[in-house]
Curated annotation (Swiss-Prot):
Its main location: secreted. Keywords: Acetylcholine receptor inhibiting toxin, Disulfide bond, Ion channel impairing toxin, Neurotoxin, Postsynaptic neurotoxin, Secreted, Toxin. One of its GO terms (molecular function) is ion channel regulator activity. Pfam families: Toxin_cobra-type. This is Long neurotoxin 1.
Amino acid sequence: TKCYVTPDVKSETCPAGQDICYTETWCDAWCTSRGKRVDLGCAATCPIVKPGVEIKCCSTDNCNPFPTWRKRP
C-alpha cells in the first residue's frame, strides 16, 4: 500500500504489514488561528481514537490526502 506521510505529505510505500492509511486531525493551542493539526501515515491497524482526535482510515493507495479546509466566511 502507498500512503501520504507527514511531514512532507508525499506518497510513500508502507512497510510490510502496514496496509492501512490514516488521517489524524486534532486541535492544539493554535487551532483557532491555524486550523487543526494533521498527521498522515501508514499503520497495521486503524489507530485507537482518543478524545478530541478524529481519525479516518482507508486501505487503497494514496487514499489519505491532506484535508482541504473550508475558509471561514
